Amino acid sequence: MDKQPVFFCVCSQKGGVGKSTFTILLASWLHYALGRDVLVVDCDAPQWSIVAQRERELDVLERNDRYKLMMVRLFKRTGRKIWPVVRSTPDEGLQAARAYLAAGDREADFVLLD
């Protein structure tokens, strides 16, 4: 990990205020609109709503050729693949991010902890 990422933590003790939605929108804007490398760490145990949403998205892509084509076009237009999501717990979020980035050629400009 040569880059030193900027860490953002989106948190609130109140549920249902849009933390995960904000995290997803921020990650997508940074990644696709600004071309920055982003890692999202979903620490929202036990829901892991960002991980669950990503799994639903991948399931739809596997079953629907129209959406698959749209994703391929997005990748070609932006030159960016989908941003990664790591499942963790609140206590282990920073360690999970660092472990993910330390494995292989992975780098991030921004790490978003939800």
At which residue positions do the language-model features occur?
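P-loop/Walker-type NTP enzyme "switch/lid" segment
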Residues: 11-14, 32-113
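Walker A (P-loop) phosphate-binding motif
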Residues: 1-36
